[in-house]
Amino acid sequence: MAALSVVCLLLAAASWRPVSASGEEFWPGQSAADILSGAASRRRYLLYDVNPPEGFNLRRDVYIRVASLLKTLLKTEEWVLVLPPWGRLYHWQSPDIHQVRIPWSEFFDLPSLNKNIPVIEYEQFIAESGGPFIDQVYVLQGYAEGWKEGTWEEKVDARPCIDPLLYSQDKHEYYRGWFWGYEETRGLNVSCLSVQGSASIVAPVLLKNTSARSVMLDRAENLLHDHYGGREYWDTRRSMVFAKHLRAVGDEFRSQHLNSTDAADKMAPEEDWTKMKVKLGSALGGPYLGVHLRRKDFIWGHREDVPSLEGAVKKIRSLMKTHQLDKVFVATDAIRKEQEELRKLLPEMVRFEPTWEELELYKDGGVAIIDQWICAHARFFIGTSVSTFSFRIHEEREILGLDPKTTYNRFCGDQEKACEQPTHWKIAY
């Protein structure tokens, strides 16, 4: 019996799961029905949203910041992060496709997210909490007086709202707002917090200044990372595994059009990200050049570090020759006219071009993920300066174990004199 107890203890130690402050284990994949008794009746809910103009890939970065806040809260109380439904993003411009109220499971693998922090979809929150009501909404903002030069000071204070609120009270004095496209959702109270610092700076406010069971942080992009580039950052980033159906589409495309498979490319992916720890440079990548060519608002802003199409193609051909690659995969947001021009300049380029039915199924966000997945598996990758789309590909390649020299590269502007290449943020386990 004693021996059996020792075995059980060893197994328990080997399979760590997040434990709440109350001592109860959190099990990934729990449904509302499973946990309605016990923890679910006591736990508190953290919700958040981001400035509407911000894109898909910046929002993924904000998730990492909020996840670190949740980990801080979990040291004291039972909390769960409610995933903000996707929708109404500036870059998602495909017509006639319904792209609001999109759950995270359309784009990411929820069991993987749950191995890092407890998360639930918004509709599960409604079911668990008793309705579409959020007890407290905090709108995060800077300080009206700005940051005074000198010593950096992390601080948070309840302050009058600087900008007009994007919430209005109805006749019942509930607050109506965007709320991710859920018109029936109401906020019971809305106030503003001025913040200057990392995400966990608001933890004392949530733990001590409010007893609200559900708290939403609007404009969460105003919070900084707790530990950018550290182990906690990478744990959360690694947990953001793309949805299995999108990875499968990307893998099929690699195989059919780019002669690329995990076995041939020396990739050793694990379905469980917590078990995946690879040496940088151990993966070879597929026999093609991966390219992210950002256009649209990047060129409208007359950025000096974005090349002309001719300049980009010249660099692409140079890289293909240097690395002896005869295939090139291009992910771009170029308008149709530029795409046609690019095709004339680079007739051999390969692109993932979904049918209307596929676009309706995967949506613009899913197509972006498929593009990133294919770029992440290339033998060599070159991206666009300061693009979060390219940054996310850098991270994905780092996770997959590709040589950093084949990852942290960007196009230079035609007249750019000092073309500084992206910084290597080394993965931490």
Swiss-Prot record:
Extract the CDD domains matched here: O-FucT-2
- Positions of the site: Required for enzyme activity? E396
Glycosylated residue positions: N189, N209, N259
Among its keywords, does the record have Cytoplasm? no
Q: Which residues form the active site?
A: E54
Pathway recorded for this protein: Protein modification; protein glycosylation
The record lists the effect of E396A as: Abolishes in vitro enzyme activity
State any GO CC term: Golgi apparatus
Q: Which keywords accompany this UniProt record?
A: Carbohydrate metabolism, Disulfide bond, Endoplasmic reticulum, Fucose metabolism, Glycoprotein, Glycosyltransferase, Golgi apparatus, Signal, Transferase
GO molecular function list: fucosyltransferase activity; peptide-O-fucosyltransferase activity
Q: What does this protein do?
A: Catalyzes the reaction that attaches fucose through an O-glycosidic linkage to a conserved serine or threonine residue in the consensus sequence C1-X-X-S/T-C2 of thrombospondin type I repeats (TSRs) where C1 and C2 are the first and second cysteines of the repeat, respectively. O-fucosylates members of several protein families including the ADAMTS, the thrombospondin (TSP) and spondin families. Required for the proper secretion of ADAMTS family members such as ADAMTSL1 and ADAMTS13.
Q: What is this protein called?
A: GDP-fucose protein O-fucosyltransferase 2
Gene from which this protein is expressed: Pofut2
